[in-house]
Amino acid sequence: MPFIPNTDADRATMLQAVGASTFDDLISNIPEKVRFKGALNLPEALSEMEVLEELNALANANQDTQKVTSFLGGGAYDHFVPSAIGAIISRSEFYTAYTPYQAEVSQGTLQAMYEFQTMVARLTGMDVANASMYDGATALAEAMLLSVAHKNRKEVVLAGKINPNAVAIMQTYGHGQEIHIRQSALENGGADLASVRELVSDKTAAMIVQHPNFFGCLEDVHELQKIAAENNALFIVSADPISLGILEAPGNYGADIVVGEGQGLGNTQSFGGPYLGLFAAKSQLLRKIPGRLSGMTVDKDGNQGFILTLQTREQHIRREKATSNICTNQALNALCACIYMSMMGKEGLTQVASLSIQKAHYLANEIQKLDGFKLKFSRPFFKEFAIELPIPASQAIAKLLEKKIHAGVDLKMAEENGLLIAVTEKRSKAEMNSFVEALKELC
């Protein structure tokens, strides 16, 4: 049967409602010379079965992680997603990307948001977290805006290597407000402390560091925090939440704001999104936090309940008075993260982080044994590392894809030569050994 949305009777009713007798009457104000004439060059209609076959054939062209061993990173990682997550988020009570507009009617959704906020705050070592942002890059840009507004300064300093895509978002956000973004020099894949000291001043609203950074290297966050504090600038940390299963929580070393990409917490890579941004801060910044906050309260009868609270950040007030104009959140993705953290617990998250770091170092050591290959930097790293190789990274990526291996990210995007390799808890020793053998054959 043809899937036509409107019957002749439906169309007649709609035409009558707008005062037109025919479809030609409806479009009479469109000049004849620009109207399409003749038949559209479309294929014959297909049955449902034929459509599914066609779509499956198109989808099979994708080189997804069900078919290809992935060492891709740079912000999106192939972590394991427990099957229970898909089952729970598919329940009709949860399955929406939006926070309800009559929020207090949906107590279950608000409680899930509240639990998510609580776990993110504990994970980052901060006082308060919001109900999520659009993605990690957006969260970082919003943190920059908060710092500029809070300090009444128009300059931020990037210490070390931050994901170039996130920096591009920050530049877009900062352009209209004339925010000056200054980049420190790099030393061995991380922030050059002398350069940072030279850049940070009493004009600096915030120092921003990614830890682990874009190259996977660990930064000297304690020293960087001191430099920020000496100049009364906010200290903003962009963290991989999985790394916090084993690395010190940013709140413990003086971070004022912690942001991050939450995709690794129970969300699939999904060819780039949707993801969710994490945003946590000290209590002094509570009323300036962007996005939505779920809070716990009691009703007039003394019953515990949940509400959206402190809503002076978005569409509930005049645009020029709002501290942020992001008016929603990634509720469904945040729910995935909430379920993931609940299922894994502290020990589970620590195990995921430990396996990732152990496997990454095993692979790095094996690659260094190959002639012509070496680590690009000697700094400690978490689950990602950069290598130099004897041929252009783009060629290595193309050749290994023929062997069903996603070799990594070409560092050309970061204006560097080399290959960025990420290793998660999913990678087996056999997969890593096959990767090493494939690299060996390139020489």
Swiss-Prot record:
**Record's family?**
Belongs to the GcvP family. N-terminal subunit subfamily.
Arranged from A to Z, the UniProt key words for this protein are:
Oxidoreductase
The free-text function statement in the UniProt record for this protein reads: The glycine cleavage system catalyzes the degradation of glycine. The P protein binds the alpha-amino group of glycine through its pyridoxal phosphate cofactor; CO(2) is released and the remaining methylamine moiety is then transferred to the lipoamide cofactor of the H protein.
Its UniProt entry gives the catalysed reaction(s) as:
N(6)-[(R)-lipoyl]-L-lysyl-[glycine-cleavage complex H protein] + glycine + H(+) = N(6)-[(R)-S(8)-aminomethyldihydrolipoyl]-L-lysyl-[glycine-cleavage complex H protein] + CO2
| Assembly and binders | The glycine cleavage system is composed of four proteins: P, T, L and H. In this organism, the P 'protein' is a heterodimer of two subunits.
Q: Which GO terms describe its biological process?
A: glycine decarboxylation via glycine cleavage system; nucleoside metabolic process
Pfam families according to UniProt: GDC-P (PF02347)
Q: Which residues cross the membrane?
A: none
Keyword Cell division attributed: no
| Protein name listed in UniProt | Probable glycine dehydrogenase (decarboxylating) subunit 1
EC number of this enzyme: 1.4.4.2
Q: Name one GO molecular function term.
A: glycine dehydrogenase (decarboxylating) activity
Organism in which the protein naturally occurs: Chloroherpeton thalassium (strain ATCC 35110 / GB-78)
